[in-house]
């Protein structure tokens, strides 16, 4: 059994694989460390959007740190986040091309491959939770607000609900327009949602994306590791 580790901006995600079969996952804050878990894995493959949290992994002799050059994706640029590249090779492997992956994390990233599996660009904007925290941090009177569980009302009658409506409805309306434009440019392409907020977005708008795949990045690590063997 081997361990895939996806380190994001605020959380880390672990997936235990037997060969290419994902058998168990864990998700927790970056500050948490399960000292027993790495010892139970025959091999560890780590991908991180930042170098800050890699030091402890580098001390493990059976751990391999993935770089962008290890990801079999053409057309990339040097500062492309490895998570975006891994998402794309995972989507291409699991669902085919063209593909557009929207990753709902601290940032919302949209990344696309064409019909030949080549990276062809994308977009980045603040994540839903990041937008909510920014309003609290950068204004004098707006309160801290969590993401709503039900779909927020269009015309809210409280400040909290108005913030939720603005962040959620307007952000997802913009994403829907982006997806529509991409579908016109790439007819027959598949859109995939992943990331921490993707399950909630799927509950709100189940038809917005063709596929919701919580563990897409972990599968991308598996594809990259498989290609390197």
Curated annotation (Swiss-Prot):
Alphabetical list of Gene3D superfamilies matching this protein: 3.30.420.40
List of residues binding substrate: 77, 81-84, 159
Cofactor: NH4(+); K(+)
A Gene Ontology cellular-component term: cytoplasm
Residues that coordinate or bind K(+): 103
EC number annotated for this UniProt entry: 2.7.1.33
Name recorded for this polypeptide: Type III pantothenate kinase
Annotated source species: Gloeobacter violaceus (strain ATCC 29082 / PCC 7421)
Lineage per the UniProt record: Bacteria, Bacillati, Cyanobacteriota, Cyanophyceae, Gloeobacterales
UniProt gene name: coaX
């Amino acid at each position: 059994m081997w361990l895939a580790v996806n380190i994001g901006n605020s959380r880390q995600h672990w997936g235990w694989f037997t060969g290419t079969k994902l058998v168990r996952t864990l998700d927790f804050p970056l500050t948490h460390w399960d000292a027993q878990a790495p010892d139970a894995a025959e091999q560890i493959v780590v991908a991180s959007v930042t170098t800050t949290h890699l030091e402890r992994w580098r001390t493990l002799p059976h751990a391999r740190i993935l770089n962008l050059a290890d990801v079999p994706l053409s057309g990339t640029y040097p500062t492309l986040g490895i998570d975006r590249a891994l998402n794309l090779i995972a989507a291409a492997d699991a669902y085919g091309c063209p593909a557009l992956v929207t990753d709902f994390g601290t940032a919302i990233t949209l990344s696309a491959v064409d019909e030949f599996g080549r990276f062809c660009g994308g977009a980045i904007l603040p994540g839903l939770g990041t937008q909510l925290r920014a309003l609290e941090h950068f204004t004098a009177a707006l309160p801290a607000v969590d993401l709503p569980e039900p779909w927020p009302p269009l015309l809210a009658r409280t400040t909290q609900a108005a913030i939720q409506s603005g962040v959620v409805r307007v952000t997802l309306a913009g994403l829907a327009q982006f997806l529509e434009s991409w579908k016109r440019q790439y007819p027959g392409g598949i859109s995939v949602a992943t990331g921490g907020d993707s399950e909630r977005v799927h509950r709100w708008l189940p038809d917005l994306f063709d596929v919701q795949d919580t563990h897409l990045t972990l599968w991308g690590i598996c594809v990259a590791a498989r290609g390197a063997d």
